[in-house]
Regions:
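Catalytic cores of large soluble enzymes that bind and process phosphate-bearing ligands
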Residues: 12, 16-19, 91, 122, ...
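Conserved C-terminal alpha-helix-loop-beta "cap" of PLP-dependent enzymes
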Residues: 60-114
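Generic non-transmembrane alpha-helical segments
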Residues: 26, 30-34, 75-81, 131-140
Length: 145
């Protein structure tokens, strides 16, 4: 019975991951289109494996030079977008994320890294909303400088 339940649970995992990855890639394309200086942290899915790793289907980590990630996360939250600056296990540390360091993100950009995790049922409409919220946040921050 357990084996049947496990097989049922695993059914469609690859399809869901591919759908989520497609929305993630669309989200990145939308971000890059309206925020040209945005930087994708980590491997791009459309390139061969980078050092044996590929991006997780629901992960998007971006930097916008000059936009402090902590401020961006607060602003995005107010706009209904959940984001973070690091994984939950490293919250509270003053050091840049060990993952961001391992990806080779320069120290001066480490404080701009914004982590977005998409749900399996994420849509292109939601991806456009994320991109728009990031742009609004970046524009608002720049106008205060």
């Amino acid at each position: 019975a357990f084996a049947v339940a496990l097989a049922d649970a695993q059914g469609g995992v690859e399809e869901r991951a591919e759908k989520t990855a497609a929305v993630r890639d669309y989200c990145w394309a939308e971000i890059k289109k309206i925020i040209p200086n945005a930087i994708l942290n980590g491997p791009q899915t459309w390139t061969p494996r980078v050092q044996g790793h590929v991006r997780v289907a629901n992960n998007l980590n971006v930097s916008i030079p000059g936009l402090e990630a902590e401020m961006a996360v607060v602003s995005l939250d107010a706009l209904g977008i959940a984001a973070s600056t690091r994984s939950a296990c490293t919250i509270g540390s003053d050091e840049p994320s060990h993952v961001i360091k391992a990806l080779g993100v320069p120290r001066e950009l480490a404080g701009t890294a914004i982590r977005l995790t998409l749900l399996p049922d994420a849509t292109k409409s939601q991806a456009r909303r994320i991109a728009s919220a990031l742009k609004e946040t970046a524009d608002r921050y720049r106008s205060k400088k």
